[in-house]
Design a protein with these regions (language model features):
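Terminal, low-structured helical/coil segments at or just beyond the last alpha-helical repeat
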Residues: 103, 107-108, 115-151
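Residue-level recognition of tetratricopeptide repeat
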Residues: 8, 42-43, 77, 111
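Register position in tetratricopeptide repeats
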Residues: 12, 46-47, 81, 115, ...
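Canonical tetratricopeptide repeat
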Residues: 5, 39-40, 74, 108, ...
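Structural marker of alpha-solenoid helical repeat scaffolds
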Residues: 29, 64, 97-98, 131-133
Length: 151
């Protein structure tokens, strides 16, 4: 819908106040829209904002779209941010299975593995990102640093 697309556009240019307004207004129309819930929740996770509320939104999104790899990645990352590494690993392992060529998903999974003490496996997933094509330079720099120093 229009509010979802406009909210996404605002979010991409960094106007988070307007993005949140449009995305929340979109949820007033359809409170269970999994894609709007995921977009808004992930945006909040990226800003370290309303983490618990974002997790609740992602659980709703996941309940209706349990095979959507983006939603699975988001909920896994949310659990990572609250240090629930066991739950996070369960979701992110599935996200990697569904999107093995996605750099963000592989990066997230590597981070989880590192936190679980599986450092060789973590470096394997980070290294796979460094070999992918068209990876954002900023992400590549972070990956290269992780491969050297870890987390």
């Amino acid at each position: 819908d229009l509010l979802y697309r406009r909210g996404g556009a605002y979010e991409r240019i960094g106007n988070f106040e307007m993005a949140d307004k449009d995305l929340l207004d979109s949820l007033k129309i359809n409170k269970d829209d999994a894609y709007v819930l995921n977009y808004l929740a992930y945006s909040w996770l990226e800003r370290d904002y309303k983490i618990q509320e974002a997790i609740e939104m992602l659980e709703i999104a996941y309940s209706s779209k349990s095979n959507d790899p983006y939603i699975i990645d988001s909920i896994g990352w949310a659990y990572y941010l609250v240090n629930d590494y066991i739950k996070a690993e369960m979701y992110l392992k599935r996200a990697v299975e569904l999107m093995p060529d996605d750099p963000i998903v592989n990066d997230h999974y590597g981070d989880i593995l590192w936190k679980l003490g599986r450092k060789i496996q973590a470096r394997y997933f980070w290294r796979s990102v460094s070999k992918m094509e068209d990876v954002d330079q900023e992400l590549l720099q972070k990956i290269n640093l992780k491969m050297i120093k870890g987390l």
